[in-house]
Amino acid sequence: GLSQSGCQAFTGRWCVGCERLRSRVVWECSPKRVVNSI
């Protein structure tokens, strides 16, 4: 997977990108978006 801005892709999933919003990381994963709190 790809890693940007301290982001890492989930194991077993393909993330096409990620963006850091305030205190959370938004993962652009197919087929849906997954949001993780940091």
UniProtKB/Swiss-Prot annotation:
Tissues expressed in: Expressed by the venom duct.
Keywords: Disulfide bond, Secreted, Toxin
PTM comment, free text: Contains 2 disulfide bonds.
Recorded GO CC terms: extracellular region
Organism: Hastula hectica
Chief place where the protein resides: secreted
Keyword field contains Secreted: yes
GO molecular function terms listed in the Swiss-Prot or TrEMBL record: toxin activity
UniProt entry tagged with the keyword Iron-sulfur: no
Protein name listed in UniProt: Augerpeptide hhe53
Domain writeup: The cysteine framework is XIV (C-C-C-C).
